[in-house]
Every structure is written in C-alpha cells, then in structure tokens.
Amino acid sequence: MKGAMAWPFLRLYILTLMFFSANAILNVFIPLRGHDLGATNTVIGIVMGAYMLTAMVFRPWAGQIIARVGPIKVLRIILIINAIALIIYGFTGLEGYFVARVMQGVCTAFFSMSLQLGIIDALPEEHRSEGVSLYSLFSTIPNLIGPLVAVGIWNANNISLFAIVIIFIALTTTFFGYRVTFAEQEPDTSDKIEKMPFNAVTVFAQFFKNKELLNSGIIMIVASIVFGAVSTFVPLYTVSLGFANAGIFLTIQAIAVVAARFYLRKYIPSDGMWHPKYMVSVLSLLVIASFVVAFGPQVGAIIFYGSAILIGMTQAMVYPTLTSYLSFVLPKVGRNMLLGLFIACADLGISLGGALMGPISDLVGFKWMYLICGMLVIVIMIMSFLKKPTPRPASSL
C-alpha cells in the first residue's frame, strides 16, 4: 500500500488508537469513581476539565517546539510522560487524578500535534487530507469500546483491576511508540528554526489577524459546540424525558464517525482550495441533526437515532477538511503554531458545548438549547458560502 495507507503511517495510526484508549476509559471511569469517593459534580467537573483546558493552552506551544526539535523526538518524550501520568491513576485518589489529567492534557497537545504535523510534512499534498482523516479515525475507535470497559471495571468494584488495565495500556503504548517513524529517516528540521513573527503567547492574536485562520477557527468552534452539547447532554435529555437510549445514540454516532472517516476520506478536498458548496453540504447535515435532536420526543426514537449518523458524518469530515485546507494556505513561517491554535479551537468548542450550553439548557430547556445549536450552525453555513474560493498561495508550499 502507498500514500496515507503505507505501513509506516499505519503504525502511527495504531499508536494513535493505543494512546487514546486510556482516555476513552478514563472519561467514564473518573466521574463514576469520583462519585464513589464523595466528590461533588463541581469537583468532578474541574478534574475532567483540566485535561481539555491544558491541551488547548499547550497546543500552540507544541507546534513551535515540534518545529524546532522534530516530531519523533517530541513524541518519544511525551510517551514517557504519558506513561507516568497513567501510572499515577493506578495508585492515587481524586487529587492524584487532577495532577494526572493536567499531565495528560500536556501530552495530548504534543502527541496530536507531533503526529498530525509529521503526517502533513511526510505525505504528498494529494494525500494530506486522507492522512489527517485516518489519524482522526483511529483516535475515535477507542470510543466504541472504552466506555463499556470503564463501566465493567466500575461494576467489578475492583480498583486493582483498573490499575492493571491502565498501567498495561501505558507500558504497551510507550514500547510500541518508541519504534514508530514518519519515514525511513526523520527529516532534518534545522531549516525550520527561523525567527518567528510571534511566540506562544502572542500567537493567540493571530487568530484575529489571519482571515483564513479566523474563518476556519470560528467554523470549528461552533461545530464543536454542537458536538460537545450532544455528548454532554443527550444522556440527561433522554433520561429526563424517557424517549430513547443515550447509549445506543452515542454508539451509533461513534460508528458513524469511524465509518465516515474510513469510507469518505477520499472525498475530502486536499488541494488547498476553499469549497463553499462542499462545506455547506457537510454543515447542513449538522443543522438537520440538531433540529431532529431538539424534537427527539416528538419524532420518535428511530429518527432520533438517525440524527446520530448525521452528527457522526459531520464530525468525521469537518475537522480533516479544515486542517488540510489550513496546511496549504497558512504562511510557512509559524505554520505549525497556527495549526496548533486551530486545533485548540476544537478543544474550546467542545468545552463550551458543556460550559455554555449547560446554563442555556437550564434557562430554556434542552429543546431550545439544541435549536440554538442548529441556528449557530446555520450562521457558519452562511460564512462558508459567502467566503470566496481561495487559490493556494505559493508561499504556503
């Protein structure tokens, strides 16, 4: 196999699956364990939120450091730190979980940037979007079984079993990760050590100065708000009104993400051009899904479950499309930091899906909250349509 499916890249995708397997378990186990330990929802929220907040803050730093040091060297250091963080889970309580979540957030920022930038730099231009899509696919696969494993461990009421599983994942991921490469020989990164027009702090201002980054970032934030609102509140929504099973809904969504990222990856543009009709078509799926979720009790369970497929398809296509586009149009100098800032937009959006939409649902109810989500997506659909197709600048090559 060639291109994004070549063996060196398949090893990277497998490493991605292994790396995110622990988090798929922890995302469910930590709240359950925290409740058993008598923690309030606020404390549990702080512990869980520390992961994504830390990842969001460190992504631009990660892009800059990777540009100077190289993705392989950074990856190997991060794998060791990640292993230490996972081992902490096996021997501590909630306070240790907080420290480990912060460490995991740092690791995730550097890990995802190392692999995505390494894939972008190593693949030919026509295969970039496919490579990023496959990375996203393998990062999602653990969500198919991780929650079930977490619930099983929690039901067993055996913290030693939890420690064994997490430490096993930590060690196998580290050992496997030390053997992966992006190519026969890691590219020389000395030419990337240039004087940056911004640093890891001032880079945040570039979000508003760079029109391409601003446009793509806003689209990613709004779409991620909907994704976050769905994953956070659909369980409460379905339980409170009793019209469907949230577990079935989220499983269907995860299957749709995995299937779409594999079977539709070749349809994702990878030419450095803006495709308004394509973006409107993809985002329209999310609008329909948001409205169906809002009227879930009225439309029935079957149609409600069908909306999970639309959400999964959108989730699978929006991120790699925008990442691939920005890899072409962003300026070469500082591109890695700017890509890190864009990826942080996805983190921010998902966190806002809970932090922002939670109070809104308290005020107006779940139905209107999801209607508002759909209206927000209509706004970014209009943005996508009005944005003129932009040819790839030669300076971005």
Swiss-Prot record:
MF annotations from Gene Ontology: transmembrane transporter activity
Where is the protein situated, by its record's location annotation?
Cell membrane
InterPro entries (alphabetical): MFS, MFS_dom, MFS_Exporter, MFS_trans_sf
> Per its UniProt entry, which superkingdom is the organism in?
Bacteria
Any single Gene Ontology cellular-component annotation: plasma membrane
Against Gene3D superfamilies, the record matches this protein to: MFS general substrate transporter like domains
Membrane topology field: Multi-pass membrane protein
Keyword Calcium listed? The answer is no
Q: Which residues cross the membrane?
A: 12-32, 38-58, 77-97, 102-122, 134-154, 158-178, 217-237, 239-259, 285-305, 309-329, 337-357, 363-383
Induction data: Up-regulated in metal-poor media.
Record keywords, A-Z: Cell membrane, Membrane, Transmembrane, Transmembrane helix, Transport
Major subcellular site: membrane
Q: What family is reported?
A: Belongs to the major facilitator superfamily.
Q: Give the protein's function.
A: Involved in the export of the metallophore staphylopine.
Q: What's the name of the protein?
A: Staphylopine export protein
Name the source organism. Staphylococcus aureus (strain Mu50 / ATCC 700699)
